[in-house]
UniProtKB/Swiss-Prot annotation:
ATP binds at residues 39-46, 101-110. This is Pathogenicity locus probable regulatory protein HrpR. One of its GO terms (molecular function) is ATP binding. The gene is hrpR. PROSITE patterns: SIGMA54_INTERACT_1, SIGMA54_INTERACT_2, SIGMA54_INTERACT_4. Coiled coil: none annotated. It comes from Pseudomonas syringae pv. syringae. One of its GO terms (biological process) is regulation of DNA-templated transcription. Disulfide bonds: none annotated. Residues 281-300 bind DNA. Keywords: Activator, ATP-binding, DNA-binding, Hypersensitive response elicitation, Nucleotide-binding, Transcription, Transcription regulation, Two-component regulatory system. The lineage of its organism: Bacteria, Pseudomonadati, Pseudomonadota, Gammaproteobacteria, Pseudomonadales. Member of the two-component regulatory system HrpR/HrpS that regulates the activation of the sigma factor hrpL which itself induces the expression of hprD as well as other hrp loci which are involved in plant pathogenicity, hrmA and avr genes. Probably interacts with sigma-54.
Amino acid sequence: MSTDIDNDVRTRWNVTALSAGHQIAMHSALLDMDLLLCGETGTGKDTLASRIHELSSRTGPFVGMNCAAIPESLAESQLFGVVNGAFTGVCRAREGYIEPSNGGTLYLDEIDTMPLSLQAKLLRVLESRGVERLGSTDFIPLDLQVIASASAPLDELVEQGLFRRDLFFRLNVLTLQLPALRKRREQILPLFDQFTQDIAAECGRSAPTLDNGRVQILLSHDWPGNVRELKSAANAICPRIAVAGRRAVEARDPVTGLRMQMRVIEKMLIQDALKRHRHNFDAVLEELELPRRTLYHRMKELGVASHIDLAAES
């Protein structure tokens, strides 16, 4: 088991910054210890949490709970469950999100977004390893491992009064910081190659080769969406989306084929930046480091839809 976990974490997160970090993930799975994963959006926290569960000795389910997606007004009943007649409209007892993780792993995604009003109640669950359904004082013991993830630095949120200090200390027993992709550029090409190999294998085709033109595009981008954005780029140029016409052109003219693939990547990067910045052009321009008129021109050339009248800007 130890070797499997060690090799798996090394394969997917094989970077100098994680030379000690992968051992933390390994020991968390082996020793059944709670773990806090920290890192920007897209750095692979969800994937690593799921993989740690798979490699652990736990036979129960992996229950992922996005803390940002739970309405605060319904949070208690959704998290802890309710008993019949707990409040108006409750006709039958039901379990919450936490109970099904009994015997398995509870993954608290984006715990940095959890309202303060719920943090104290979550702390009680983590310390007592059990829940009380809303409307009941009966304690339901749970056997679970807890993995939490955060995009914002929890210690800073504590100082700002946005996160409970005692909950932070409870979560901060084992912490793994996943570095941004721009801080481990030596992993861009190996990860991209792994993604294209995986995607190509799914559709029974050969993965595209990393020629010099594509390499320069991949290495020069800062990848603010991190591994998730890199995987999207791999999907964009993988053979499964290639139409027959493009394959025929590439077969006749490799240079033309390369240009078309580069256009696909460029379009994807612009679309991704627009989406993340909600079409805030100033933010997109700063990220892509392009003059305004150049961005407008490239968007028109590539057929990128926008909320702005590009014709008026060209």
